[in-house]
Amino acid sequence: MEYDRAAKFSSNKPITLFRYTLVLFFAFTATGSEQLKVLNYNVFNSHRHGKSYEAAVKWVNTVKPDIAGWQELVGWNEAKLKKLANDWHHPHAAALKSGGYNIGLTSRTPIEVVARHQKGFWHGYLHCRTAGLDVIVCHLWPGGVRQQMGEANQLHALVTRLHKEGREVILMGDFNAHAASDKAWMDKQQPLLERRSSGDAKKRPEDRFIVNGKYTFPIMNRILEAPLHDVVRTKFDIKHPKPTQAQCLMIASYPTRVLGHVKTVELQRGFLERIDFILTTPSLAKRCISAGVAREPAVLETISDHYPVIAVFKN
């Protein structure tokens, strides 16, 4: 997220949060060679310009992902990513471009770069093959619906083609967009809606994300048609068929309390949203064992303004 580094739960929910994150911790750490663990993480201007890098590496090494997608590797090139990826035991790495707001992929297994694509994107996407999968890491621009839809259409076309070819695909990243499956709880995020509405109203009508005071969902709707499955939401719905608002906030991926306007749990609660996703083609989704947004330990409140997303699959 860039245009608004804009919750957690109310203070009477600490036990619920602890239990939820404890379950995720064991699901995400008890993997062996028969499983594949995937991490997506927007690291906020290269770990807050390096200030949170050591804490980030320490946390990643507790999770032990097999594949990791990264956004906001600001100023990093591929050589730097390859060097630093050894800190979390990933000997293979690829980056979208030579600098700027970069996108990266690191892996325990060799990476074949299929495409580094920027045309028609503000940032772009990195398409690679690793661990027998097509892995696409993206970062969508939050400025307006038309630009985002152009980016979404390109991702839709790419995944549709790969799916028809029989490829298993992971599309992950910071989408700066919301899923229609989150509408019920997003409609209640009034502080967030109020914060965004004034800026959104200044855009041309066709570029507005908020209509009649509520978020719309054209971007993720288009991407999910590819077809792709939102594995975090799927696993959440199985566990919580009739979720409360507080339970829904457990899958929010942004913002952490590192940002000034959400310094407390009480303030943060009204601004939580889910804009970071791990999406997969149907056959791979069937092999998903667990998926969620890591909201603990507390160090995640200081590493980035985003929370990481993790999914585990049967190999």
Predicted regions and their residues:
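Metal-dependent phosphoester-hydrolase catalytic domains
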Residues: 116-117, 161-162, 181-315
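Catalytic metal-binding/acid-base residues of hydrolase active sites
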Residues: 44, 74, 141, 175-178, ...
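Short, Asp-centered acidic motifs that coordinate Mg2+ and/or phosphate
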Residues: 36, 67, 168-170, 277
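Structured beta-strand-rich core segments of catalytic domains in phosphoester-bond hydrolases
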Residues: 70-150, 292-293
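N-terminal, active-site-proximal structural segment of metallo-dependent hydrolase catalytic domains
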Residues: 4-5, 11, 15-17, 22, ...
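Active-site neighborhood of phospho(di)ester-bond hydrolases with catalytic His/Asp-centered motifs
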Residues: 68-71, 170-174, 230-233
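His/acidic metal-ligating clusters that form di-metal
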Residues: 149-175, 216
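Active-site-proximal beta-strand elements of phosphoester/diester hydrolases
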Residues: 35-45, 132-142, 172
